[in-house]
Amino acid sequence: PEAAVSWYRQGAERGSVRSMYELGRCCQGGIGVAEDLKQALIWFHKSAEVGDADSLGLLGWSYEYGIGTEQDYARAVEYYQCAAEKGNASSMNNLAEMLANGRGGPRNFEQAMFWYQRAAEAGSVCALYNMGWHAEQAGRIAEALDCYRQAQQSGDEAAFWALGRFYEIGIGVEQDPKQAFALYQAGAEKGNVNCRCRLIRCYALGIGTPRDPDMARQLGRALLCEKLDPWDLEDYGCQPELEQLRQLMDTLET
């Protein structure tokens, strides 16, 4: 990594846009160099000034979450918009999320759906999942199910949780606890927090699998002791799932 950083630095100093971006990524992640979030932001700004879509997207991310700078939703929207207009799929999805949730400006659901669709067409699996979530909230269950299935088949970890809920309860499909358990288990193996919460519940209550309170306690303690990423906690449904898990663990520990 150190050698790569040296090459990136030389390239960046000569004006290579890609080198500026890669050097920023190294500074942001502490790869081959000491982590320096503010320096990462400087390099992203330099490459964004000449129109690099990836850098524009990462600037949006940095301002959305306050990484190396003060959190600023309005600026995040600006950078996501610029990157999205240059065809950056993840920025299209992130812009849609900001618009759908009214971050950085008034909520604009119509524009959000436009960018979700564009993002999905550009290959964003997250956008498929997000479209499914909003369709579910609006009561368009068949549409939600279709989006979730497409996202799950493409490997989106959150879609395993969404589909698992549908099979557990019987929403738009025939109720199938075993299928729900299998989906939660697969999503948990990918690290999805919501799936991990549901998997623990399955073991505790015997949903789709033999009841195993010891396994539930073991997995529950591990999850509740973990320091979770802030963006994991912002996933749709994550806070309610964690709250239900805490209540379940109180019951299991007594």
Q: Where do the model's predicted regions map?
A:
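Short helix-capping/linker turns of helical repeat alpha-solenoids
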Residues: 13-16, 29-31, 36, 49-52, ...
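TPR/TPR-like alpha-solenoid repeats
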Residues: 11, 26, 47, 62, ...
